């Protein structure tokens, strides 16, 4: 008998993967957590029925969240990741030699625990001496921070459950306060096919707070529609004006200095969402 998992991305559309075995399943304090081994994408983390990451395609998302803002900032030393308990963004952050400290604030400690167990290639960096892991509410952590971080990355789930507060204008205002005077932040902002209104709303809210606000995309096969967006807000540095000498060699599978600029070239229907 074959076992298949289907994520219903809308009421009428979804993505299906063949499952070899279930590694762990649990109702945590915050969400339903499943870790499964798939035939095509390796081990897969699923939260509340939604694919969060897989061993096969995780590098796309994690590289694009981390490297776009980190190469935009001239000297990122203190970095905060809100969410991201699988550790993938932290792994990419630590590839930048200027980074002296990376703080991870994840509300669900079980995500960290089982990512370390079943996704070691992704979560291994959480044990690095430069990393401080805090299990707690990222919204509250931001509210309690001021003029502290060079770069803040919001690696959240969809705007449901514990992540709802991470898609509000008040949260973005708090991020601005938590950043230094030339700070940068980035957040994943879903896809333009099924949630166009989210992209429009977030971009508008961020633009009212940050003088430089841009949208960029990446192709992620296991995420809804495969086309994913990220919104970047910056107080001073424009991601489209990064000098050539700022790019240094790091090991990546998706991100390149050429792709850095290309990611901001939007299909017309996507660009129309933020006009």
UniProtKB/Swiss-Prot annotation:
Transmembrane segments: none
Any one GO CC term of the record: cytosol
Keywords (A to Z) from UniProt: Cytoplasm, Polyamine biosynthesis, Spermidine biosynthesis, Transferase
Active site, per annotation: 155 (proton acceptor)
Primary site of residence: cytoplasm
Assigned EC number: 2.5.1.16
Subunit description: Homodimer or homotetramer.
NCBIfam families: MFS_SpdSyn, PRK00811.1, speE
Full protein name: Polyamine aminopropyltransferase
Species in which this protein is naturally found: Bacillus mycoides (strain KBAB4)
